[in-house]
A protein has these predicted regions:
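N-terminal signal peptide c-region/cleavage motif recognized by signal peptidases
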Residues: 14-19
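Bacterial N-terminal signal peptides that target proteins for export
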Residues: 1-8
Length: 108
């Protein structure tokens, strides 16, 4: 029993030392997203791939946006333009962009 309590106390101490997940800064994200509006801000815009319609990303779930941008950054999602853009962002900047976009109303 004493060993279990010791292990539990050690685990609790270790977990409390972990950094909290960083919350993105929506104002910084708004500035970072400025270049993204060239594609994501135009209604019915189609990029170099005529069959690919660029999605509106405002109002998306913050966790989804972080996962998607991180996936492009790591090469797990394939789209040359998005991979190039995402590779230029730090994890903090991705969190900032996601915070900004998730604060918007979804596009109609």
């Amino acid at each position: 029993m004493k060993r279990i309590l010791t292990v539990a106390a050690g685990l609790a101490l270790a977990l409390s030392a972990l950094p909290a997940a960083a919350k993105g800064d929506a104002e910084k994200g708004k500035q970072l997203f400025y270049t993204c509006t060239g594609c994501h801000g135009i209604a019915d815009y189609k990029n170099a791939y005529p069959t690919y319609r660029v999605p509106k990303v405002g109002g998306q779930n913050e966790g989804y946006l972080i996962a998607a941008l991180t996936g492009y950054k790591k090469g797990e999602r394939s789209h040359p333009t998005m991979q190039a853009q995402a590779e230029s962002f730090t994890d903090r900047e991705i969190a900032d962009i996601a915070a900004y976009l998730s604060s918007l109303k979804p596009a109609q």
